[in-house]
Amino acid sequence: MEIENRQAKHNYFIEDTYECGIVLKGTEIKSIRAGKCNLRDSYGIIKANEIFVLNMFISPYKEASIYNESETRTRKLLLHKKEIKKIAQDVEQKGLTLIPLKLYFKGDKIKLLLGICRGKKNYDKRESLKRKDEQRQIEKAIKCKYYCVPVMFLYCLF
C-alpha cells in the first residue's frame, strides 16, 4: 500500500529526498494499512534538532473507539543526526520546505519519503504542464508510428 502526495510534484520543485521512519500509534497503523491517510496539506518542521510532520491526516480506525488519536496530530520523524543537520542547513540557508511525498511499507515498517522542496510560481506550473503535454504527444506519435499501418500500404495489398 502506497499513499502518494500527487499535489507535491505540481506545486514544488523537489530538490532532494530522504527516507525516514515515523512514530505512530497502533490504530494509526491499522488505518494506514486500510489506505485511510492523506498527505496533501502536510509539511515538516524542525524543532530542537528533531523533525516533525504536521497536518498529516490519518482517519480514525473504526473498531477502536476510545484509543484513537487526533487525526492531524504532530508526528515525529526518525532520521540520523547527520541527515537532520543537513536538512536543517538546507531549509535555513536556501529557504526550502519539507514536504512528505510518499507513505509506504518497507517490510513491516512504515516509511515516509520526505522531500526538500522549493515552491513553484504560477508560470512554472504552466510551463511544466506544457512540457508534460508535449511529451504525451510525442509518445502518442511514436506509438502510432510503430503500431498504425499506413493507409497506402493497405491499398497496395488488395
State where each predicted segment sits:
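Compact, glycine-rich, soluble single-domain proteins
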Residues: 48, 56-93
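Enriched for short, Lys/Arg-rich terminal
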Residues: 119-137, 141-144
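A positional/architectural concept
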Residues: 1-50
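Beta-rich strand-turn-strand
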Residues: 80-115, 119-121
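Flexible glycine-/small-residue-rich
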Residues: 26, 46-48, 55, 114-118
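Hydrophobic residues embedded in beta-strands of well-ordered beta-sheets
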Residues: 51-52, 110
